[in-house]
């Protein structure tokens, strides 16, 4: 019988990242775990609908036995079984992030007995989680280099707080993992600005695009009007395609916040990324830790190692026989497998 791993949910930033990482890993390794103090660092601690959906999805996919899977629970015991490929559907029941649920369970399906499809309904454009286009256009091309073949499709948008969106991913078992090397970003090839609108006047998007164009030379400027029943909502994105990597940044519009202020927040974030020669942005760095650990080799550079990144590394090192090295030189941190 494998040893139970005990985790402290207050570790790092005390949010949901440690729980998501902890759920992904035992599905792969077969090691049970217990976690206490779930989301202890948040104003409303314990499991929210999004986290509970991730727990139930993980349990269904690997036939786990679970204790503490209920709203508000701050303690969870998870004993995994065998991962099974198949066609899965999960509903969050709120505007909680579809992509965060997908990112919890998809790594386990890289080791399944056959191809799978996972569909999640909930929020797709959430200020605290990556939109599906980030997964599709940024993360999945990098996963393909590592040897992971999955394809995410956005079936319907669902903005916060209403939700109602649907995202699906098709994934195949991995034959072998490759080392990812992302030491340098390379020269910029092009930049693309994009605005999504649902039940919001078009002039909002035009002002947002104008703000982006005032700071960057945009090769593309796209405005997409979605059906009103998918809103109200507004997301502004800017994609930076470089020689070695494509990064994508976004800001979700808010009520009583002007179009110019929303777009200016995005401009600030992109300028911060471009000010450093690091290849990887802060959020993408979090997502590369687990696949790189499974490959057993690789490296990337990031300007600022976030608390999320360091929490993710700490959890991965509890479950897998790997050690990460973080070396800072001239304002850039090189993250690699020792």
UniProtKB/Swiss-Prot annotation:
It is found in: Cytoplasm. GO terms for cellular component: cytoplasm. It comes from the Bacteria. ATP binds at residues 103, 283-287. The keyword Chloroplast does not apply. The active site is at residue 308. GO terms for biological process: RNA processing. InterPro entries: RNA3'-term_phos_cycl_insert, RNA3'_phos_cyclase_dom, RNA3'_phos_cyclase_dom_sf, RNA3'_term_phos_cyc, RNA3'_term_phos_cyc_type_1, RNA3'_term_phos_cycl-like_CS, RNA3'P_cycl/enolpyr_Trfase_a/b, RPTC_insert. Pfam families: RTC, RTC_insert. Its EC number is 6.5.1.4. One of its GO terms (molecular function) is RNA-3'-phosphate cyclase activity. Keywords: ATP-binding, Cytoplasm, Ligase, Nucleotide-binding. It catalyses: a 3'-end 3'-phospho-ribonucleotide-RNA + ATP = a 3'-end 2',3'-cyclophospho-ribonucleotide-RNA + AMP + diphosphate. Belongs to the RNA 3'-terminal cyclase family. Type 1 subfamily. Catalyzes the conversion of 3'-phosphate to a 2',3'-cyclic phosphodiester at the end of RNA. The mechanism of action of the enzyme occurs in 3 steps: (A) adenylation of the enzyme by ATP; (B) transfer of adenylate to an RNA-N3'P to produce RNA-N3'PP5'A; (C) and attack of the adjacent 2'-hydroxyl on the 3'-phosphorus in the diester linkage to produce the cyclic end product. The biological role of this enzyme is unknown but it is likely to function in some aspects of cellular RNA processing. This is RNA 3'-terminal phosphate cyclase. It comes from Escherichia coli O6:H1 (strain CFT073 / ATCC 700928 / UPEC).
């Amino acid at each position: 019988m494998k040893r139970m791993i005990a985790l402290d949910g207050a570790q790092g930033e005390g949010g949901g990242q440690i729980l998501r990482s902890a759920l992904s890993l035992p599905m792969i390794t077969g090691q049970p775990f217990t976690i206490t103090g779930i989301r202890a660092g948040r104003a409303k601690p314990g499991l929210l609908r999004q986290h509970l959906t991730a727990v139930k999805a993980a349990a269904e996919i690997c036939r786990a036995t679970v204790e503490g899977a209920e709203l508000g629970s701050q303690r969870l015991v998870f004993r995994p079984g065998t991962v099974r490929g198949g066609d899965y559907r999960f509903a969050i029941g709120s505007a909680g992030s579809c992509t965060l649920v997908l990112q919890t369970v998809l790594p386990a399906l890289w080791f399944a007995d056959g191809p799978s499809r996972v569909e999640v309904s909930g929020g797709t454009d959430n200020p605290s989680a990556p939109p599906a286009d980030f997964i599709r256009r940024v993360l999945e091309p990098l996963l393909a280099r590592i040897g992971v073949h999955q394809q995410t499709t956005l079936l319907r948008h669902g903005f916060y707080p209403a939700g109602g969106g649907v995202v699906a991913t098709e994934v195949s078992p991995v034959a072998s993992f490759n080392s990812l090397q992302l030491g340098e970003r390379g020269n910029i090839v092009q930049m693309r600005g994009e605005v999504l609108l649902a039940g919001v006047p078009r002039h909002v998007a035009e002002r947002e695009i104008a703000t982006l164009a005032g700071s960057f030379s945009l090769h593309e400027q796209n405005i997409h009007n979605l059906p009103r029943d998918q809103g109200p909502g507004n997301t502004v994105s800017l994609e930076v395609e470089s020689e070695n990597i494509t990064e994508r940044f976004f800001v979700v519009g808010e009520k009583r916040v002007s179009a110019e202020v929303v777009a200016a927040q995005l401009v600030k974030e992109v300028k911060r990324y471009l000010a450093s020669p690091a290849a990887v942005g802060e959020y993408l760095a979090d997502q590369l830790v687990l696949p790189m650990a499974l490959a057993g080799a690789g490296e990337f550079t990031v300007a600022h190692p976030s608390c999320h990144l360091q929490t993710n590394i700490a959890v991965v090192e509890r479950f897998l026989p790997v050690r990460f090295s973080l070396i800072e030189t001239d304002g850039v941190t090189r993250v690699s497998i020792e």
